[in-house]
């Protein structure tokens, strides 16, 4: 079985976990590791794009469990194209963030950035609505943490507004998913 469809989720998960434990690394090492992880994600995305370019759809059942009990990842041309686009934008964003880094940034930025990529790429690959909700929540939690990165008073105030609006949106999303599954 080809395990490549899970790689866009595993790479940022592993990179983010390593970066969480790397608080004593020099900033340049964290920058380089995070950038290497994104370049690896771009390589995987391009490989997946090439694999589905002729039309086949890759389906990956985690743990061998079939739906509706298992988590299913689906890679089609749209998902693969969005993975490539995400990796390119992430690479450009990280290069910009590294260039603007004055050495005073908190060491958790790169880990949170990787976890945000985990949520985005998982949302593109998921094959059902409930797991789409789960990946959206992973994405939102990482974005809340990035927004609060630094704990300035204006950031906390802005984060409170974002969290309240996103909680309302998440509740409506979950209600919609429950209604769809209930039908």
Locations of the language-model features?
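N-terminal transmembrane alpha-helices
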Residues: 5-9, 13-17, 117, 121, ...
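Proline-rich low-complexity regions
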Residues: 5-8, 12, 68, 142, ...
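Specific lipid-exposed transmembrane alpha-helices and their immediate membrane-water interface residues
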Residues: 10, 14-15, 49-54, 58, ...
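Generic enzyme active-site microenvironment
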Residues: 10, 74, 135
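Small-residue-rich packing faces within the transmembrane alpha-helices of Major Facilitator Superfamily
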Residues: 13-16, 42-45, 91, 114, ...
